[in-house]
Amino acid sequence: MNSLFASTARGLEELLKSELEALGAHDCKIVQGGVHFQGDDRLMYQSLLWSRLASRILLPLNEFKVYSDLDLYLGVQAIDWPSIFGVDKTFAVHFSGVNDEIRNSQYGALKVKDAIVDSFTRKMDQRPTVAKQQPDIRVNVFLQRDMASVALDLSGEGLHQRGYRDLTGQAPLKENLAAAIIQRSGWQPGTPMVDPMCGSGTLLIEAAMMASDRAPGLHRGHWGFTAWNAFNEALWRELTTEAQVRARRGLLETSSRFFGSDIDRRVIEMARANARRAGVAELITFNANDISKLVNPLPEGPVGTVISNPPYGERLESEPALIALHNMFGRMMKTAFGGWRLSLFSASPELLSCLQLRADREFKAKNGPLDCVQKNYQLTANPLGAGGALVAEDYANRLRKNVKKLDKWAKQQGIECYRLYDADLPDYNVAVDRYGSKVVVQEYAPPKTIDPQKARQRLFDVINATLAVLELPSNQLVLKTRERQKGKNQYEKLAQKGEFLLVSEYNAKLWVNLTDYLDTGLFLDHRIARQMLGKMSQGKDFLNLFAYTGTASVHAGLGGARSTTTVDMSRTYLEWAEKNLRVNGLTGQQHRLIQADCLSWLSNTDEQFDVIFIDPPTFSNSKRMETTFDVQRDHLVLMKELKRLLRRKGTIMFSNNKRGFQMDLAGIAALGLEAKEITALTQSEDFARNRQIHNCWLVTHSQEEK
């Protein structure tokens, strides 16, 4: 009787125990990551050939305490290695774990290798060769605290490597995990199965192998036991011959049929090739199709199971498309697959909620480092594909009301960029902005007291509802998360797409970028201020400080300004400003662009201007600025410098976004200036709920100064 250990992915131990017991294993004991069991030689080989769930089958050789590297060396050398494999065989050591003395797994593996080689040298005056690739013998050592376990890895390569999958698409499932997903799905051999996002076909192939009684190890070309001195070749040949007979008979007898599709034709060709190598190609029909074209391949029955591992995405920008995909998929399941079962495996339970289906069973498992969930659903017939109540219904109703009002208003105003929703409801803390045919959803970062998973679920509900209310394709929605920007973060790129969209604002054309930066290049709340500047600037010399992408300069130029001077510290934004000026025909020496620290430039210029627009940051500590700037603390210093540049009948428009900003009117008067607040005049209909989004002032020389 052999004492053996079968390892597996965390979360699959109970399934593996049941599988081993069905094969005839005794005394099965679950530990984290595997199952200890007993069995004779026949059972040992059967577990290697037939286990669909095990990652490896190990034969323990020794267990001992390790308090030093010498203890490790002596414990390994105590094993009679020449009785296990011949000196003419190659070997490799896989070492995992550390303790206070063995702090590096590579060092531990080196000590084990030395002990094995020295064991041969002492007894035979010869040494075996170490081979990193496909060794004849693989020694597994696991160190936990002060206990080391040494085992012979009978598998060689991991058992998930069945031998049929030479090529895969992106993010493939390991075969043993795929087998577990199928077993947990409720699918029964003899019934049909569909995978509409099948990738390289692993789920379908594993299920077809189960249905046709094909041993998962039948196609492997390399094992870890064939160079073992105790290898029973006759018994192994008997078992593999029996497995081949069963596979041929099973292929003829099974009534199961399998259907797979994927949008990627190249991946579908991989899936077909994998199925041929696995010997189950005749059971599986593969098609290259977009999931939106999915139909039930057996509309007249019998009913079966839809099993899939849909994409979950790691980048924020991909989430709107994935949310739309899951929402559409849920509707299709109800429309075309009534009476079937559905089982989905995903790293994102939030995306699964977008199906708008109620799961009747749920399992957890690891897919490599990812925590994943598998949810099973019983699909009820619904030929219209209608779901339940729209998710985030309060939000959807408010957005629908706002859209009806604001779309009409925007058309009358001659603008195509405006805010549709601005955290109107406390539970849905987002801003929704329309930019022509596209929509940007900005999530305000939730407080740390809010459960991150709950916040993420609520955001997904918002996106789902936004797509539905606006009847918007998912590729027209851009998702961003807005949080307090510190230092240079406000200038750093979020993406590298470089996609610009030309939009209209009154008589101006402006370039926006919805993906690459936190802001889009157009501050919507300053729209009326820009319009006012255009009217104020006819025949005037116009200065735009902290100019960002120069949109105010565009309006001034279109309003007939004699000259525009646009100053900003960022080369990126100045190049953007130049694009904005050029697309409006504002070229020539009278339209200057200056890259400089605005505060330093102010201190060093003596130029005169009729209209000055300044919209400084609330606070700045950029490395390229010599000092910090605080708009509340420093606005008088700023006004003193601006006064020098302002012609006697000129006007400064001063705006900032600091909530609770207090203009020092006495200090302004002491400078010989007058300030008049015009905030209410610069606030538009789409920002009616947020009266504190900015404050705005007109500053002129006092009557005495004039």
From Swiss-Prot:
Main location: cytoplasm
One term of GO molecular function: 23S rRNA (guanine(2445)-N(2))-methyltransferase activity
Classification via InterPro entries: 23SrRNA_methyltr_KL, DNA_methylase_N6_adenine_CS, RlmKL-like_Mtase, RlmKL-like_Mtase_CS, RlmL_1st, SAM-dep_methyl-trfase, SAM-dependent_MTases_sf, THUMP_dom
EC number: 2.1.1.173, 2.1.1.264
THUMP domain span: 43-154
One Gene Ontology cellular component annotation held by this UniProt entry: cytoplasm
Keyword set includes Glycosyltransferase: no
Cell compartments where the protein resides: Cytoplasm
One Pfam family matching this protein: THUMP
Keyword entries, A-Z: Cytoplasm, Methyltransferase, RNA-binding, rRNA processing, S-adenosyl-L-methionine, Transferase
Catalysed transformations (reactions): guanosine(2445) in 23S rRNA + S-adenosyl-L-methionine = N(2)-methylguanosine(2445) in 23S rRNA + S-adenosyl-L-homocysteine + H(+); guanosine(2069) in 23S rRNA + S-adenosyl-L-methionine = N(2)-methylguanosine(2069) in 23S rRNA + S-adenosyl-L-homocysteine + H(+)
Xref: PROSITE patterns: THUMP, UPF0020
NCBIfam families associated with the record: PRK11783.1 (NF008748)
Similarity remark: Belongs to the methyltransferase superfamily. RlmKL family.
Function: Specifically methylates the guanine in position 2445 (m2G2445) and the guanine in position 2069 (m7G2069) of 23S rRNA.
Protein name: Ribosomal RNA large subunit methyltransferase K/L
Species annotation: Yersinia pestis
